[in-house]
Amino acid sequence: FNPVGVAFKGNNGKYLSRIHRSGIDYTEFAKDNTD
């Protein structure tokens, strides 16, 4: 897992789960979430 992935898991498990289902990269999701 990337540092971002771990951070998401620690903050909210839904983010990590959604990434797996959507197949979105951790970095991409991080950018979208930050926006």
Swiss-Prot record:
Tissues expressed in: Expressed in tentacles.
UniProt keyword list: Nematocyst, Secreted
Highest taxon of source: Eukaryota
Location (main, coarse): other
Keyword Secreted set for record: yes
GO cellular component terms listed in the entry, alphabetical order: extracellular region; nematocyst
This protein's record includes keyword Secreted: yes
Disulphide linkage map: none
Localization terms from the record: Nematocyst; Secreted
Cited function: Peptide with unknown function. Does not exhibit antimicrobial activity against Escherichia coli and Staphylococcus aureus.
UniProt protein name: Peptide Hact-3
Species this protein is from: Heliofungia actiniformis (Mushroom coral)
